Amino acid sequence: MKDFKQYIEGNLGKSLKDCSKEEVYLALLQFTKEKSAALPQNNGKKKVYYISAEFLIGKLLSNNLINLGLYDEVKEELEAAGHSLAEIEEIELEPSLGNGGLGRLAACFLDSIATLGLTGDGVGLNYHYGLFEQKFKDNQQDAVPNVWLTPESWLVPTETSYKVPFGDFTLTSKMFDIDVLGYEQSTKNKLHLFDVESIDESLVSSDSIAFDKTQIAKNLTLFLYPDDSDEAGHLLRIYQQYFMVSNGAQLLIDEALAKGSNLHDLAEYATVQINDTHPSMVIPELIRLLGERGIEFDEAVEIVSAMTAYTNHTILAEALEKWPLDYLEKVVPHLVPIIKELDARVKAKYEDPSVAIIDEHGRVHMAHMDIHYGYSVNGVAALHTDILKESELKNFYEIYPEKFNNKTNGITFRRWLMHANPELAKLLDETIGTEWRKDASKLEALKAYRHDAIVREKLDKIKRGNKKRLSVYLQEKQGITVNENSIFDIQIKRMHEYKRQQMNALYVIHKYLDIKSGNIPARPITIIFGGKAAPAYVIAQDVIHLILSLSELIANDPEVSPHLQVVMVENYNVTAATHLIPACNISEQISLASKEASGTGNMKFMLNGALTLGTEDGANVEIHELVGDDNIYIFGEKSDEVIAHYEKGDYNASEFAQRDAIRPLVEFVKSDALLAVGNKERLERLYHELTTKDWFMTLLDLEDYIETKERMYRDFEDRDEWNAKVVTNIAMAGFFSSDRTIEDYNRDIWKLN
């Protein structure tokens, strides 16, 4: 095989050491694309089409080199010529195709589908500016377009194009592909990203994400989740969703026909995984397309119901999409009669209005359509699936118990261990052998080393090295200096009240006041946040403002700053995560119990040797079961208790706000000290929210949270015992490999050859 050095010499006519970083990057990108282009596609009879509004794939250069088995070789060649692969990788722009856990999960799943040699492609949209790039200005979030599309990217233009009909016009699509490589696999899959031929980037200025939301032919794929605080925003999201599923459905039918399907047997050639409710219109669209090709309505419904499966990712009512019928009449009038007929069939069979597709207010419940007309409904962690069956979707579970199943989420160890933490991967190879790279369950062999002083010392050294690396990264990106000898306590996830970043911020206030009164911690503490708030989500932006204001206040206080530091990472993304996660000591997983479907950050931290501070929520429950009581720090009320509070309506924030331990903390939010660096309107609004509404019960768990976190800080000082817990966590993380998750999906749902 021609190595990279020869490739450079042959293509650029000069030696590797004479090339600039940019030349090396562009050549390495092309070299890797050519290697992956040469691989044949997986081509089983049946294919899974994983349709998702988001694919948070991260930078691909190192990931693809690892999966091609070329990473070490290329790294050594570069080093020998005076280059650093890490520096070369810095030049790569991160694709802006997702935002949170939903998109990152989709990316991990594609990696695992390819690694297992299964035939499965992703289907999504080619967003030009993603969600947005986050900047901080005046201690507030500022959103600007996240530019990532350049001529030199992983996107490969294709000849595939479809006509997508809307109410008043038809748009022509253009399909771009990104190769999805499996780990040490000789085949590949694809991520298909659809764009509009008529897109117009000039609608957007460089310093704002505002744009004309009515010019659909020009704006359709500009942004992920465009602001939907008005009707134009709602309509644009429906246009986007239909454009995505119509292209996916047309592609799926074409590919099945090419393989010999007569369409009556389409379910033998294709299965569609609906990732959250955004792709739900694929059901009526497939029925429509089959009808156009001469298949009777009843049979079309039967075919589609045998080939669509739905993953529920949330129990938050606001996230289960319900579109007004009159909006659908405007955007996709040709689907409305189909949806009405599907609804009529449900209503003829079941009198219970709570299971109708169209409710009494004329809103179409997308999840209801998915459940009635799909063959599988899965939750993404054991607790989440139980809540779906016992409360949120109880009425559906009673009708279709056989459709419901759990598929606990997972993460790809290629990116989150081999790439993000190569020193730890090397230690694992030396200690337990390399089998874990292909079979994550083999990590459990590490348990035998819990009391091995040499292994614990090596783990400690690796953690210190990763803290140093993060410290350099934060200095380069934001000019922030952190104390590498401090405890790194990290909460990184999208900003949402149910994830309770505000509770962590109240802890910061507690610690600040504690230090001011003379209680100096045994070791300095660095509390790090990262995450974006949706532009229309005011309270989440207020929480960011509180965190940034506290950061400034503490940094300027010579009494407190040597002992406590607060950092908010700007524009948190996959790249930032690969620096933050390996450096972490304490993993904050503090959502209100019952609200987080699964979480995958908790798994990434566990795998990289952080200990979890968490509620009994989502996959924290399964982490707790795997590692045992002594190796995790659990606090707060349990999900059944929380659900009971909601049912009885007996949680009163204002009563909790008056408690002796809580009052000084919430009052500080609108104190003169904070107002000196903060915005009065934002801080007072947040104070009012916390002390009168507090819908996600921050104050309910706050005292237990503070006590548990303080205990964790004390335990950190017993380094041997702490590192023994770290060993157990890493050893038990194998269950959370996305390879295991995908094996489960395939065995129970997709049944690919």
Residue spans of the language-model regions?
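A conserved ligand/cofactor-binding region detector
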Residues: M1-N753
